[in-house]
C-alpha cells in the first residue's frame, strides 16, 4: 500500500491569541468537538473564530461557549445554521472530573486556545487559566520588547 500524501498547509483553523495575553495558562488539554456537517465544511473553509470562547460545565459535561462558526453561503436551506451554538466537548470522565475540580478554584477558568485538524478530526486545545492583572500584562510586553531589542543588538554586532 502507498503512504498517504501529506497535504501542504497548516492544520490550524483558528487561534485565540488574546487568551495568552489575558491569562496565565497553567495546563493544556486536547478535546474533540461534537459538530454538525455544515460546521465541518465551514471550518474547512476557515470560517471559525474562538477569540471570545470559553468552556462551561453543565450536567457533568463540558461545552464550548462563545465560539463562532459562520455558515457557508452555499449551505443547505433545510438546515437551520446557528453560528454561536454551544458545542459539546468530547472528553473522558477522568479528564472531565479533573478539569471541573481545577476550574472551581477561585480565579480559574477554562479557555479555548486553538482549533485545529488532527488527521480528519477537528480538535480544540483548551487551557486551565488564571487571569492576569494589568501589571502582569505590562511586564510581559516589556519582556517581549527587550527580547526583540537584544536580538536586534546581537544581529548588528555579528555583522561587524
Swiss-Prot record:
This protein's record includes keyword RNA-binding: yes
Main location: cytoplasm
Superkingdom as given in the UniProt entry: Bacteria
InterPro entries (alphabetical): SmpB, SsrA-bd_prot, SsrA-bd_prot_CS
GO terms classed as biological process: trans-translation
A Gene Ontology cellular-component term: cytosol
GO MF, any single term: RNA binding
Pfam annotation, one family: SmpB
Function noted in UniProt: Required for rescue of stalled ribosomes mediated by trans-translation. Binds to transfer-messenger RNA (tmRNA), required for stable association of tmRNA with ribosomes. tmRNA and SmpB together mimic tRNA shape, replacing the anticodon stem-loop with SmpB. tmRNA is encoded by the ssrA gene; the 2 termini fold to resemble tRNA(Ala) and it encodes a 'tag peptide', a short internal open reading frame. During trans-translation Ala-aminoacylated tmRNA acts like a tRNA, entering the A-site of stalled ribosomes, displacing the stalled mRNA.
This protein's name: SsrA-binding protein
Organism: Mannheimia succiniciproducens (strain KCTC 0769BP / MBEL55E)
